[in-house]
Amino acid sequence: MSAIETSRAQPAVAYVPAQDNPHLSVLLDMRPALDGFYGIPQETRLLFSALAALPGLCVSGLLQMSTRRVKGGVAQGAASSEAERVHRYSKAVVSLKGQSVTDWKEGVSDWLGALLHKWALRWGAWTGATPIRLQQFETRAFRDFIWQQLFARSVPPTEREQVLRSDYRICSSPWRWMHLAGIERAWLLGKSRYPRLDTRGVDVLIAQTPYPGRVSAGTMLVVHYHDAIPVLMPHTISDRAFHEASHFQALAANVRDGAYFVCVSEATRRDLLSLFPEAEARAVTIHNMLPSHYHPEAVEPGRVPGIVRRHLHDEYRPRGGSAKTDRSMYKLAKSFSNEAEKSAFYAQAFGPGSRFVLMVSTIEPRKNHARLIEAWEVLRDRLDPDLKLVLVGHIGWDHKTVLEGCLPWIEQGGLFMLHSVPAESMRILYQQATVAVCPSVGEGFDFSGAEAMRCGGVVAASDIPVHREVYGDAAVYFDPYDTQSVVHALQALVYADDAQPRAETLRAAGLEQSARYLPERIVPQWEAFLRGLAGGGAQV
């Protein structure tokens, strides 16, 4: 069955016009937006901005940290002075930014409070008593913090006022602690259950991953489901024992509790239903949306050398590492004797007539950097010793093999590792790259190929179901487990006699394919889904 046919088989969601339900309260989990540029953090920001613009929806954000308590905030309905309210909001900002104790005495008190907090979460998971009360946070006095911390990395400034109209609720309980409370219960009784959030007054809570909590009566939980990789490919993830258990146990509990699931691709929906077929009537597919930063208008190729120089990783120091052979530091940028030599090198390496292959992804096993590097080495040896490789992304986990393989090429001036590249600069790289490569062995959606297409780039991708679904006929595909397959795909795109006309055909197809993920295509699907929930839920 094709992706289109499978997509048609999913339950239809009834659409209720906005005027029939003018005050739908939506609480959106913003935890992923506190960190990271791309992927789930980006989609979280874009979705919040898009929903905040819809008439008849009252959208607020849920502020929660992964491993630290969020302090401050004001209890709903509490009588307090303006000064006291601002002070308590300010405490929340401090705790969201990092350490929030002033001396050792407060540190001891904080440690004891954390111990009691964990036992309260266990009690809530076991008994369902003492729901977690959500504190209020008003944006008005902290507009700069909310914009810079949550939205600026993905949302265009033209939407700034739109997102700053919303307020927030604070969950003081760390996400990881809530997960552990449910996992511990599953260890003893064979079935997970989680603490309950006091979500009275909220119609829909949208979580960005399987959520370690239950909601109040009258609130519907919607899980924005990005992938099942922690369960289906646990060998590729970090902190494997915790992430596999937390994902599966929370997902199982969400399914039992009647949650709805918005999957980012039909491939992800199939993975969900392979684990929990009973969720079929409550699982729909709405693809991720692309940010408006990415568009095909011509860029200035002369800016590429400067972009590469500004965003080089330079030095990277791994955390931990017990083996004596582990490096304490990786030098991830080429050395130069003086600034003039450095400037001349980058101007030549990325000047007129230069070619570079681009990959945008966190460095982690599933992304398959090593395979691309092997294929690129073959192309340099056989055909083009001047072909460059640009890797954009943060350094994740299990990265030693990839980084060790990069070091000699970095010093030779053939490979460049970048990070924290803003969207406008990424648009230039996508458009100027000879080809953008997406070699992953597993994905839930994979933004990078669709973003490259939207910028007018040429894409080669691994032949996995989600890439076939998301990229359609606008990419060249290869076997991600076969280096020669990658070589042949890139050779055909770059060096074959018909490479130029083929690239132009792919650019045109990519613009059409990527248009499916523009906000004007995706947001109406979200609105229909949410109105459908308010109007009685999904209808099969």
Predicted segments with their positions:
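Carbohydrate transferase catalytic cores enriched for Leloir-type hexosyltransferases
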Residues: 2-540
